[in-house]
Amino acid sequence: MKILYAFLLALTPSLVACSQETLPDTVSDDLVDAIDSTELLPSLHPLARFLSMQTGEIQVHPSLNFENWNSQKVGNVDFGSIVGAGEKVEMIAVGGGLTAGVCNGGLYREGQLFAYPNLVAHQMGLTDFEMPLFSENDFNGTGYYLYDNPLAKYPKWKKVTNNRAPVTGGVPPVLPKYEGNTSNFATPVGSSQWLKNSDREDLMFRPYLARFATPHDDDNSPESVITDIKRDHSYNFVLIDDFFDHWIETMQLVPNFTFGNFNGSIEQYGDIVKYSINEILNQGQKGIIFTVPHFRTLPYMNWFKFSELLDPSTNPDASYLMPAPFISRIFEQHKPGSKFTTRLDAIYVVDAQEASFADPASFYNPKIKDYAQRHNLAVVDLYEVYERIHAGSYVTDDGYAIDGTMKGNFFSSDGIYPTALGQAVVANEVIYAINSKYHSQIPLINISEFVKTIGFKK
């Protein structure tokens, strides 16, 4: 493990005597980066929650036309071996922010409508798949953040403040109750294991779960949210996105995370965390499960790059920088061509060993694929999909180029979760996987037409 402080460039006599054109670029400040205290509900945005990263407030109204797209007929759907002749597909979804529809660092109605489970349900012709939407009046939900200038070299954000759902303070904070039926049980910072064990009131998923389900506070009780789901839903197909949010949350523990933080279940019993998934699938239900993308493919981990400060060969142990207000100030003050000598605390640096711990391709993704094989699940290899998007080589079947950069069309302003277009791309990957595994014929979303129909602009 790296030492507490990492020097990106060793100080040498030649550096001290450098010319004016290469003056040392040493950044130090004593600023306290306060988190926005006006928010009773902790922000889902990894960086915009800091006041120093906000440039102001903005009022935003829904701009994408979901109903215009959703009202279109899909055509014939052949479910292949998903269900028997004459049987109906009844689908639920579990998981984290991707499945819940987190976008731009918030959970709000427009993001929920375009979440990939809702898009997949449309393509499957399922009219009874329900999302726990925020109300039409509280359409901005938890609130969210938009890039102040999407074309800027380094990001800052504006805070969306209008038509938000009222939050009651407490532990946990309380959001308005969703009164309808739901088929999507995913929550931000969530996974199916929290549907099994929901007794911790201080965990971030709780306010979102409590909107549409009743958390069971007695850990010794046989009751759980999963018990409620199984009692109230006769589902036979499940969308499972269980591990990505854990990966993102664990990355923020640097420099204190270990191999076990990411791969503890493999260390302990040689498999993925599966007890809740096993219970959800205990009647032989079919479905899909996602692999975990590598963090390097996210704009979140590319807002501030080592390569812009120094030649990577100068400090081969330093792999990635964790976004933070202090790091932002370093990049804003750094003068191209100057020598960079600022001392960085280890909390900002993901070194080569830590990066290897966090690589899901080494251990966890193979185990996800093994689990899928044993349980007759289709696999959406999100690791491979995000690698292609990151490399700039992803083009949809209808010829639409997908851009995974900060200035691109796939990721929203939180640098982690997709835009509406990105969710449609994920939905198509889900459909690819389902059709391949179960010999079904579910129509893909025509991305070019989707973009035109909903009025997406990026």
Give the positions of each predicted feature:
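A short helix->loop->beta-strand "cap" motif at the edges of active sites that frequently abuts
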Residues: 282-286
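Mobile gating loops/cap/lid regions near enzyme active sites that modulate substrate access
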Residues: 301-359, 366-417
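Catalytic nucleophile-elbow at a beta strand-turn-alpha helix junction centered on a G-D-S/GDSL motif
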Residues: 88-105
